[in-house]
From Swiss-Prot:
Compartment annotation: Plastid, Chloroplast
GO cellular component: chloroplast
Annotated source species: Cyanidioschyzon merolae (strain NIES-3377 / 10D)
Similarity comment text for this entry: Belongs to the RuBisCO small chain family.
Gene Ontology terms describing biological process: reductive pentose-phosphate cycle
Keyword flag Heme: no
Matches recorded under InterPro entries: RuBisCO_ssu (IPR024681), RuBisCO_ssu_dom (IPR000894), RuBisCO_ssu_sf (IPR036385)
Name of the protein in question: Ribulose bisphosphate carboxylase small subunit
Pfam families: RuBisCO_small
Gene3D superfamilies: Ribulose bisphosphate carboxylase, small subunit
Domain of life: Eukaryota
Other remarks in the entry: In this alga, in contrast to plants, the small subunit is encoded in the chloroplast. The basic functional RuBisCO is composed of a large chain homodimer in a 'head-to-tail' conformation. In form I RuBisCO this homodimer is arranged in a barrel-like tetramer with the small subunits forming a tetrameric 'cap' on each end of the 'barrel'.
Length: 138
């Protein structure tokens, strides 16, 4: 199962040149760019690990691509994404986010039905990846 999170999630994986162009777009908008990674891509897991600090005031996409490559070397079997943060007053939110690396095998998710009181049906998404301990999931 292919994890679909962020911009471009339904397109084929971006090439490094396409990633560089998206980073250049973010820089042109004045957004701060950061790199994050995780081995638990659950849709509600919005707290991925940061790879270094956010890169404020960087004007060259090669600097950010270097950080992406270093993160890929360190975590080749993790999900890695690039985020662009718009710090404009009143917006102050992620403006762009896309996955730039994924494990070769994506185990996917299962939807579990849980019966509750008063015959209420609740549903829970469970990641197969979390059945293994952190650090050995892929």
């Amino acid at each position: 199962m292919r994890v679909t999170q962020g911009t471009f999630c339904y397109l084929p994986d971006l090439t490094d040149e396409q990633i560089r162009k998206q980073i250049q777009y973010a820089i042109n908008q004045g957004w701060a760019v950061s790199v994050e990674y995780t081995d638990d891509p659950h849709p509600r897991n919005s707290y991925w690990e940061m790879w270094g600090l956010p890169l404020f005031d960087v004007k060259d996409p090669a600097t950010i691509m270097f950080e992406v490559q270093e993160c890929r070397k360190q975590f080749p079997n993790h999900y890695i994404k690039v985020l662009a943060f718009n710090s404009t007053k009143g917006i102050e939110s992620t403006a762009l986010s896309f996955i730039v690396n994924r494990p070769a095998n994506e185990p996917g998710f299962v939807l579990r039905r849980i019966e509750s009181n008063d015959r209420v049906q609740r549903y829970q998404i469970h990641s197969y990846a979390t059945e293994k301990p952190e650090g050995s999931r892929y």
